[in-house]
Amino acid sequence: MSHEFDYIIIGAGSAGNVLATRLTEDADVSVLLLEAGGPDYRLDFRTQMPAALAFPLQGRRYNWAYETDPEPHMNNRRMECGRGKGLGGSSLINGMCYIRGNALDFDNWAKAKGLEDWTYHDCLPYFRKAESRDIGPNDYHGGDGPVSVTTPKAGNNPLFHAMVEAGVQAGYPRTDDLNGYQQEGFGPMDRTVTPQGRRASTARGYLDQARERPNLTIVTHATTDRILFDGKRASGVSYLIGNANDATEARARREVLLCAGAIASPQILQRSGVGPAALLRELDIALVHELPGVGQNLQDHLEMYLQYACTQPVSLYPALKLLNQPGIGAQWLFTGNGIGASNQFEAGGFIRTRPEFAWPNIQFHFLPVAINYNGSNAVNEHGFQAHVGSMRSPSRGRIQLKSKDPRQHPSILFNYMSHEQDWQEFRDAIRITREIMAQPALDSYRGREISPGIDCQSDAELDAFIREHAETAFHPSCSCKMGEDDMAVVDGQGRVHGVQGLRVVDASIMPEIITGNLNATTIMMAEKIADRIRDRQPLPRSNAPYFVAGERPVRGQPQRAVSAA
């Protein structure tokens, strides 16, 4: 194998696979793609069947399974921080919700110096370029991109429709497309699933086009030790194959592209001598360039589950029973449809809880079964639940190396719930969810409140529940943020400040977390920056209109008023 390439990409995840595919469209460009995990085994139902999404989080084959330091505002819990490992990265193990973030997220990014071309109208063409939506393209959606997107269909679980209707009856808007003109309100939720009912990871959508190209070399089980520098120019990568301790080196003629995600990208930069000087000195790492923002500004979405018994036998509870699973698996395997072909997050919504929020600050995912996201703590009866959490918490965390060992996990602290706004939003979210669940649309299905339980009412009781039970939505981001301020790590094209030949392209470069799931936006960002790397003209800006709430009230009159108790 040659050890010199035009580009070396570190991390074959949601962003890295996009770059590998787009850069190798130019036949005279050579690319080395390094992935610490293994292949995306297509015969492994755990990563290929949408309904099996909890399984990869339970093991270590596809999951880095990071843990946080004790979180001081969460009863000092060490909290899960699962990240994808293997071709596809976190798109290989995520919940497959195709949500892009709100138009105003991007317009807000673009207010920062150097990020003027990150408005929604600049980004929308790249969302469309990446997408192939099963019901065809329009001004907001693509029809022939690498990412297969499936829309909910008639005949799916009646609880989805009842929960959306309940949200509308509670006084909130209805929308027919959470990624379309109006991203506020309740409606159906698209998913990254192929027409054959398989998970649409970036390994399937992008790498399948590119993996046979002679100018792309993919190396799996390759753990990056550090980026090599000649002075201040990134010149290559040192990496370990499998369990070996002797490093292999590869050289980059043009650029090194770091796409290892919001946890590993700052870790690799720090190990390579780019980061906070005091930390690097403490670890005896030679300083290449001081960038105090590397590993800072860490953000995530936290969420809770509100669970209810279901009085009719329409939930997915029977699908949790072992005796029913072979039939579900066979139907999925041979026909590509049935329960197995859906992630079961087919309805959701975004709302504003208070007038001071210009765009939604709370997200709902509805699930027609009562169970933890990672498959634990299933309720032993028919049930359903709402996942609810705040979108743009003011809390900020950090990632820092604990040693030079590339196989040691870093110290991670999200500092969840460290602001009063966090507590206010989560209390509001629980109380609003209860109002939604009390609406007439759910009368035929709603049993008792299982969790938190109706005895949990006061601020103090709700706060105790949040501290003990809130969990990550697995959306770490923003730890190598774009911008030009003193804490920015990269510019608006992903180029690392103060050095040459090095970019970061993944969720870590978001300056602020978006309103929703991260995968679609991470792919969009990679598509957009790929054009910059290739020195191509950006796609023409969109002029599609989009909803801005303005002076509209956050909600109308609920059909059934519910006392806050």
Swiss-Prot record:
The keyword Flavoprotein belongs to this UniProt entry's keyword annotation: yes
Catalytic class of the enzyme: oxidoreductase
Stated name of the protein: Oxygen-dependent choline dehydrogenase
Binding site for FAD: 6-35
Region of interest: Disordered: 541-565
Catalytic activity of the protein: choline + A = betaine aldehyde + AH2; betaine aldehyde + NAD(+) + H2O = glycine betaine + NADH + 2 H(+)
Species whose genome carries this gene: Ectopseudomonas mendocina (strain ymp)
Key words of the record: FAD, Flavoprotein, NAD, Oxidoreductase
Single annotated GO MF: flavin adenine dinucleotide binding
Keyword Nucleotide-binding on entry: no
Lineage: Bacteria, Pseudomonadati, Pseudomonadota, Gammaproteobacteria, Pseudomonadales
